[in-house]
A protein has these predicted regions:
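Glycine-rich Rossmann-fold phosphate-binding loop(s) that bind the pyrophosphate
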Residues: 9
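Extreme N-terminal starter segment of soluble prokaryotic enzymes
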Residues: 1-4
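A short, Lys/Arg-enriched amphipathic alpha-helix followed by its capping loop at the start of a domain
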Residues: 16-27
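Glycine/small-residue-rich loop that forms an oxyanion/phosphate-binding "nest" at active or ligand-binding sites
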Residues: 59-112
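Glycine-rich, highly charged phosphate/nucleotide-binding loops
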Residues: 44-62
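N-terminal positively charged helical leader segments and presequences
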Residues: 32-36, 41, 46-49, 67, ...
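Hydrophobic/small residue at the entry helix of a nucleotide-binding pocket
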Residues: 12
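Short, polar loop motifs at secondary-structure junctions
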Residues: 31-37, 99-104
């Protein structure tokens, strides 16, 4: 059983996993790829799930893990997964926290 479910794939997701590992917080970290999993800390407190889930799959994870909170630390442009996470948390009545980057994290020289 995990205390929290973190959807990662960003630096912030990895940092949250490291924090949980260092503070004895049981966390399930869900990443889309094997590469994302390789970047996470190896710890008895960090449980890694690899793969992409739709809203129904995420709701099932929430129920199976029995978490009371979910953290969405996915990439800012990963709109679909954020939509699925939000729908699943609403369905399961679980608190959702979304990690957002500061506006100054946007590269001034980038062309969007």
């Amino acid at each position: 059983m995990c205390d929290i479910l973190i959807f990662g794939g960003t630096t912030e997701g990895r940092q949250l996993a490291e924090f949980c590992a260092g503070h004895g917080i049981n966390a399930c970290i869900s990443v889309a790829t094997e590469y994302g999993a390789e970047l996470l800390p190896q710890s008895e407190y960090v449980h890694i799930n690899i793969g992409r889930e739709d809203a129904s799959g995420i709701a099932g994870m929430i129920e199976k893990l029995g978490v009371s909170a979910v953290i969405d630390a996915t990439h800012p442009y990963a709109k679909e997964v954020t939509k699925n996470i939000t729908a699943a948390c609403t369905e399961k009545n679980v608190t959702l926290y979304r990690i957002k980057r500061a506006d100054d994290a946007i590269c001034e020289s980038a062309i969007y």
